[in-house]
């Protein structure tokens, strides 16, 4: 069966318009900026501007980590872009999502609020399969709902597996991609301990990530 990409959706540091994001990347614009300036070591990250209220009611946000919020928003934008038929068989719609670590913000909040009442939805909020599950619930997809956790390759693997599923005739519509939301102090400190995050001089955060430069020093979270 022929496979085609019919819609795109992004929530990125360069906005949620795919064309504008691509143009910004082609111009070499950096979205990396300083974060958590109170930490012992300077850190830079690329943050996506995001208004959760655009996609969720206050009640719906209960137990939904930012990583799942981003996934739902991007999936909705992709479905809108595709003009997906409203009468599609739910059992023929699959969700294939990449997520390397899951809901870091939920776990961080639980740790920092250990002496207070623990939110009862903390566990499902930080599970790596939460983004796929929330996308499936939002789109009422009843086909395969799968999560791929393969470090930085997670989203790429998810998209490839989705294409295979369509090609094999397992689904008619595959919502595929990935999300991550790791810019919280605990995760930043953990990556710093591995000495993998890029260093930068004061005022030079935007130039921190230069993977092909001889003086490269690491990457930035986003």
Per-region residue spans from a language model:
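A glycine- and small-residue-enriched flexible loop/hinge segment at structural boundaries
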Residues: 35-85, 128-142
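Acyl-thioester C-C bond-transforming condensing/cleaving domain
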Residues: 16, 27-31, 80-91, 97, ...
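Generic anion/oxyanion-binding catalytic loop in active/binding sites
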Residues: 10, 64, 148
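ACP-dependent fatty acid/polyketide chain-elongation machinery
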Residues: 1-60
């Amino acid at each position: 069966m022929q496979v085609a990409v019919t819609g795109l959706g992004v929530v990125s540091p360069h906005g949620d318009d795919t064309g504008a994001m691509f143009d910004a990347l082609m111009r070499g614009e950096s979205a990396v900026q300083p974060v958590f300036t109170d930490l012992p070591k300077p850190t830079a990250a690329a943050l996506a501007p995001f208004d959760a209220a655009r996609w969720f009611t206050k009640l719906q946000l209960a137990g939904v980590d930012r990583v799942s919020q981003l996934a739902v928003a991007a999936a909705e934008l992709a479905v809108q872009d595709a003009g997906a038929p409203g009468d599609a068989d739910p059992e023929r719609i699959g969700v294939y999502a990449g997520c390397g670590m899951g809901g870091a913000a939920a776990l961080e909040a639980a740790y920092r609020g250990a002496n207070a009442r623990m939110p009862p939805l903390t566990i499902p909020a930080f599970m790596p399969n939460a983004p796929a599950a929330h996308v499936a619930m939002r789109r009422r997809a009843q086909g395969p709902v799968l999560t791929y956790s393969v470090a930085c390759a997670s989203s790429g693997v998810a998209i490839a597996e989705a294409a295979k599923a369509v090609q094999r005739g397992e689904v008619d519509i595959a919502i595929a991609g990935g999300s991550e939301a790791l810019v919280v102090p605990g995760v930043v400190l953990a990556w710093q301990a591995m000495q993998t995050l890029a260093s930068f001089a004061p005022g030079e955060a935007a130039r921190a990530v230069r993977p092909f430069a001889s003086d490269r020093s690491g990457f930035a979270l986003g």
